[in-house]
């Protein structure tokens, strides 16, 4: 699925509204339902799964936004931002095909609604990402009601069968030739209602509040990584399971290092004299300074590898390397005497017939040959 266009699967454009998406989904679902394709069941099942998954994501505004921005994996795992719904696709399936195929999905009576998954973006420095850190976050969400402990009831409450759906949790609406099942608007699919519900949560078993969580970020995480905290999302209705919380990692740009996988890269300026004569330099790493020996006649762009000075993988014990690329700085703010010394130095280089600038000589030799061949 990750390499397929969900809009193309449903046959709609990227600007399609929800009515167009729903209409396309219903048409394709009826066409490719396995029960309607007994002679081609394997292909129909595969198509039907794709259609279902495409509709699950594109019918949810937050998942759709996540898909448009980050792609299939982000939308499918619920890592878009702010908060989002995991959804229950079996409900959609039952709504569309409940009557057509003999009520494929049976209603479970008093149905509980799992809490939505939530997402939270944490911004880290490179040092925090590499060494790990403990972060405290605040999330405004639905939490279990402390008054009724999630039951939605108080001492005077009692449950009774929903008079609208007679306990089925669904009502049916006629649309043309089809009877479409939808969650009961009175009991919201639970099949029963609470008389004299909890005053604090109004019978839902949950209330809006701000939670404070301490999150342990493991060492070695990288930009775009996601951490799943099971059961730390939105509280479910009437004691139903809570959703999950997804922590999405964003690592700020570092003034010295650039990270690629488990390797680190940096650009290290050296003086003209050090490039010519060589010397020892102190190189910064995320674990302190180390000595790097620069050989004589080092050219700009030369890269030195410091093994094991990169990042330890969050998924294994392997450690990356640090790559230092040198750039030779041209002296500035020269005095008259210094300029004269450089001119004398240049004249000395031209004596004796030796080549001191092989790259320049090769470049200009190629230019001469180019014009000679015109």
UniProtKB/Swiss-Prot annotation:
Binds 2 Zn(2+) ions per monomer. Zn(2+) 2 binds at residues 162, 165, 184, 187. GO terms for molecular function: ATP binding; heat shock protein binding; unfolded protein binding; zinc ion binding. Residues 5-71 form the J domain. It comes from the Bacteria. Pfam families: DnaJ (PF00226), DnaJ_C (PF01556), DnaJ_CXXCXGXG (PF00684). The keyword Zinc-finger applies. Its cofactor is Zn(2+). One of its GO terms (biological process) is chaperone cofactor-dependent protein refolding. One of its GO terms (cellular component) is cytoplasm. CXXCXGXG motif repeats lie at residues 145-152, 162-169, 184-191, 198-205. HAMAP family: DnaJ. Homodimer. Belongs to the DnaJ family. The J domain is necessary and sufficient to stimulate DnaK ATPase activity. Zinc center 1 plays an important role in the autonomous, DnaK-independent chaperone activity of DnaJ. Zinc center 2 is essential for interaction with DnaK and for DnaJ activity. Participates actively in the response to hyperosmotic and heat shock by preventing the aggregation of stress-denatured proteins and by disaggregating proteins, also in an autonomous, DnaK-independent fashion. Unfolded proteins bind initially to DnaJ; upon interaction with the DnaJ-bound protein, DnaK hydrolyzes its bound ATP, resulting in the formation of a stable complex. GrpE releases ADP from DnaK; ATP binding to DnaK triggers the release of the substrate protein, thus completing the reaction cycle. This is Chaperone protein DnaJ. It comes from Dichelobacter nodosus (strain VCS1703A). The gene is dnaJ.
